[in-house]
């Protein structure tokens, strides 16, 4: 028996999306966002779907592809300090179940949004640009790449 040792991850960011119930909670949070936006009077259904998609993708971009480091004091001696949450997830292994889920979710939301906006040109362009802004950083070829030095430090 090891007294005084903890059984935890070196970096908790690596396994947070593999926790029990996190996928269901994520989908329910998107649904709750949509219901809250639907409750705003005088806002049409297509606008609500577009807002749901844009807010979701903006949050995903900020939390997964912009914020770097960990909110915890980790014993990894700063290895995760320069990595985004997406790069830390599953220890950087590509094509895991969590990464696939987080890649497919904005695509499904995009299809739903396109359908409910009846493929209106303005909504379609906004939603497509939003989708590309969260899908392109997820590509394995862009792992650790900082385009034009943005978010380098």
UniProtKB/Swiss-Prot annotation:
Region listing for Important for ceramide level-sensing, in residue ranges: 1-17
A Pfam family hit: ORMDL
Keywords per UniProt: Endoplasmic reticulum, Hydroxylation, Membrane, Transmembrane, Transmembrane helix, Ubl conjugation
GO cellular component term of the entry, any: endoplasmic reticulum
Side Extracellular, residues: 118-121
Keyword Kinase: no
Modifications made to the protein after synthesis: When hydroxylated at Pro-137, ubiquitinated via 'Lys-48'-linkage, leading to proteasomal degradation. In endothelial cells, ORMDL3 proteasomal degradation is controlled by the sphingosine 1-phosphate receptor signaling pathway.
Cellular location(s): Endoplasmic reticulum membrane
A GO biological-process term: ceramide metabolic process
Record's function text: Plays an essential role in the homeostatic regulation of sphingolipid de novo biosynthesis by modulating the activity of the serine palmitoyltransferase (SPT) in response to ceramide levels. When complexed to SPT, the binding of ceramides to its N-terminus stabilizes a conformation that block SPT substrate entry, hence preventing SPT catalytic activity. Through this mechanism, maintains ceramide levels at sufficient concentrations for the production of complex sphingolipids, but which prevents the accumulation of ceramides to levels that trigger apoptosis.
Subunit structure comment from the entry: Ceramide-sensitive subunit of the serine palmitoyltransferase (SPT) complex, which is also composed of SPTLC1, SPTLC2/3 and SPTSSA/B.
Domain notes from UniProt: Ceramides bind to ORMDL3 N-terminus and stabilize it in a conformation that physically restricts the accessibility of the substrates to their binding sites in the serine palmitoyltransferase (SPT) complex, hence inhibiting SPT catalytic activity. In the absence of ceramides, the N-terminus is flexible and permits substrate binding, thus liberating SPT from inhibition.
UniProt record similarity statement: Belongs to the ORM family.
Alphabetical list of PANTHER family matching this protein: ORMDL PROTEINS (PTHR12665)
Protein's UniProt name: ORM1-like protein 3
Source organism per UniProt: Pongo abelii (Sumatran orangutan)
Upper lineage: Eukaryota, Metazoa, Chordata, Craniata, Vertebrata
Gene assigned in the entry: ORMDL3
């Amino acid at each position: 028996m090891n007294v005084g040792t903890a059984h935890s991850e070196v970096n908790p960011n690596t396994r947070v999306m593999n926790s029990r119930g996190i996928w269901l909670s994520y989908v329910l949070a998107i649904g709750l966002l949509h219901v809250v936006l639907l409750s705003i009077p005088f806002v049409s259904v297509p606008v609500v779907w577009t807002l749901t998609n844009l807010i979701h993708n903006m949050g995903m971009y900020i939390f997964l592809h912009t914020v770097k480091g960990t909110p915890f004091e980790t014993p990894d001696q700063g290895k995760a300090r320069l990595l985004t949450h997406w790069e830390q997830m599953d220890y950087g292994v590509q094509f895991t179940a969590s990464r696939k889920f987080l890649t497919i979710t904005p695509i499904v939301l995009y299809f739903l949004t396109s359908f409910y906006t009846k493929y209106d040109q303005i909504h379609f362009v906004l939603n497509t640009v939003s989708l590309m802004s969260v899908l392109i950083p997820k590509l394995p070829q862009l792992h650790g790449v900082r385009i034009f030095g943005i978010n380098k430090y």
